[in-house]
């Protein structure tokens, strides 16, 4: 990305993030570690995996986020530049004025509540549209990777709607 005349090249190597060849942070399941000072920053998430609060290792609240149902930022207090992982824990890409979330399989536009690529399993649900996010029910559903959505109850339990051969489905079926 460009800021003024300066160009920054970001590389993602697993959980490590490099900018211009220098390690800047390492992502973990609970937050991230900044390489410049080796400090841990914790994500406090809601039942859908939305990063609601970011807390520094010393207990200082660095960021508080509130979301519209389809993932648009309703408000973000303190510094909006603390970290880019927001709705469903996905990276919010603000390049060129676009607020798109990167789900891996495809990009998502929260202002439209739509994907920017066809649903890979869209032939199974043609009545819902090929670009609809979470069957137009973002309050009770999540889509962890842009490929399939799941129901989430108020306790944060994910209910599998379709059985596949994926390991997470096999584990779910086994009761683990």
PLM features: what roles do these ranges have?
Residues 5, 21, 38, 155-156, ...:
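Intrinsic-disorder/low-complexity loop/linker signature
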Residues 58-73, 96, 104-106, 110-176:
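Short turn/helix-capping motifs enriched in Asx and small/polar residues
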Residues 1-11:
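N-terminal presequences and immediately downstream first alpha-helices
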Residues 2-3, 17, 151-152:
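Short aromatic-centered micro-motifs
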Residues 1-2, 19, 54, 115-117:
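Short hydrophobic/aromatic-rich beta-strand segments that constitute the beta-sheet cores
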Residues 28:
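Conserved, surface-exposed functional patches that form binding/active-site neighborhoods
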Residues 8, 14, 19-20, 24, ...:
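A motif-centric feature for acidic-aromatic and gly/ser/thr-rich catalytic loops and repeats
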Residues 24-25, 159:
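Short, isolated positions in well-ordered beta-strands
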């Amino acid at each position: 990305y460009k800021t003024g005349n300066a160009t920054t090249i970001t590389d993602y190597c697993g959980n490590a993030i490099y900018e211009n060849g220098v390690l800047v942070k390492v992502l973990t399941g609970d937050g991230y570690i900044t390489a410049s000072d080796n400090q841990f920053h914790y994500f406090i998430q809601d039942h859908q995996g939305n990063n609601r609060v970011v807390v520094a290792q010393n207990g200082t609240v660095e960021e508080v986020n509130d979301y519209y149902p389809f993932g648009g930022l309703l408000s973000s207090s303190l510094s909006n530049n603390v970290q880019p992982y927001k709705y469903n824990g996905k990276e919010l890409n603000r390049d060129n004025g676009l607020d798109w979330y990167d789900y891996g399989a495809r990009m998502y536009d929260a202002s439209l509540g739509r994907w920017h690529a066809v649903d890979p399993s869209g032939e199974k649900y043609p009545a819902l549209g090929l670009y609809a996010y979470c069957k137009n029910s973002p309050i009770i559903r999540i889509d962890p990777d842009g490929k399939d959505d799941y129901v989430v109850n108020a306790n944060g339990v994910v209910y599998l709607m379709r059985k596949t051969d994926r390991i997470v489905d096999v584990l779910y079926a086994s009761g683990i």
